[in-house]
Regions:
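Accessory cap/linker subdomain of secreted extracellular hydrolases
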Residues: 89-198
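Primarily recognizes the serine-hydrolase "nucleophile elbow" in alpha/beta-hydrolase
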Residues: 38-110
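Extracytoplasmic/secreted proteins, especially bacterial periplasmic and envelope-associated proteins
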Residues: 3, 28, 32-35, 64-67, ...
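Short beta-to-alpha linker loops that shape the active-site pocket of alpha/beta-hydrolase fold enzymes
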Residues: 10, 15-19
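Alpha/beta-hydrolase active-site loop
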Residues: 6, 23-47
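Short amphipathic alpha-helix adjacent to the substrate-entry channel of hydrolases
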Residues: 1-11
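Alpha-helix capping and helix-loop boundary segments enriched in small/acidic/polar residues
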Residues: 20-31, 56-60, 178
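Short, proline-enriched alpha-helix->beta-strand connector loops that line the catalytic pocket
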Residues: 82, 197-200
Length: 200
């Protein structure tokens, strides 16, 4: 950001997580990014109506940017002539494969995972954006899981650190969660949010 500003380029910083933390809900985040670009063209305070864009994201920003690249031709075809490039750094395109590799579920779900906190952040965002698919989600949390979510659910970084490293996933959700319809719906939401499964 600093380098771009030093070179005289305007910088747009859309909040893809939103005020209430929708971590890794990338379809929604992609609309935030694309609508922000449209806003740049439509506002009248600065002479930017014909501005072109380079969209850059790393880590979670990379996931959002990758999904935005897939979604843009369908959701915002009016921006095609103005988006020069999407640059993705460390943006996982497949959240389900990522969860497997991190041991968030599957064979390693009983082992301590330093990434359990990221699962919680995703779960909170999914519950907020897809309540129709997850009507019974919170009944699957253990007392520990409920306490962590209640105290930190509206702020991404504290939620990430609140669970902390070395906490087995079984301490967060009750036995049977991974065989439940709620979990199956969660996998579907993960597909919705993964550019690897993008239907376009």
């Amino acid at each position: 950001v600093g380098a771009a500003l030093a070179l005289g380029y305007p910088v747009l910083l859309p909040d893809g997580d939103g005020a209430n933390n929708i971590y890794a809900i990338n379809r929604v985040a992609s609309h935030v990014i694309l609508d922000s670009m449209r806003m740049v063209h439509e506002q009248h305070d600065f002479p930017l109506a014909k501005s072109h864009f380079v969209s850059l994201g790393a880590s979670h920003g990379g996931m959002m940017t990758g999904y935005t690249a897939a979604e843009q031709p369908y959701y915002a075809p009016d921006l095609t002539a103005y988006v020069n490039q999407f640059v993705v750094n460390e943006g996982a395109p497949d959240l389900i494969k990522l969860a497997h590799s991190f041991g968030l579920y599957g064979e390693l779900q009983n082992a301590p995972s330093v990434y359990g906190s990221f699962l919680m952040s995703f779960v909170v965002g999914a519950a907020r954006e897809y309540p129709d698919l997850l009507p019974h989600l919170y009944q699957w949390f253990t007392p520990y899981g409920k306490a962590v979510v209640k105290g930190n659910r509206s702020i991404c970084t504290p939620l990430t650190f609140a669970v902390g490293p070395g906490v087995p996933i079984k301490n967060i959700v009750k036995e049977g969660f991974f065989a439940s319809q709620t979990f199956k719906n969660m996998l579907q939401i993960a597909k919705y949010s993964s550019s690897f499964y993008y239907p376009g």
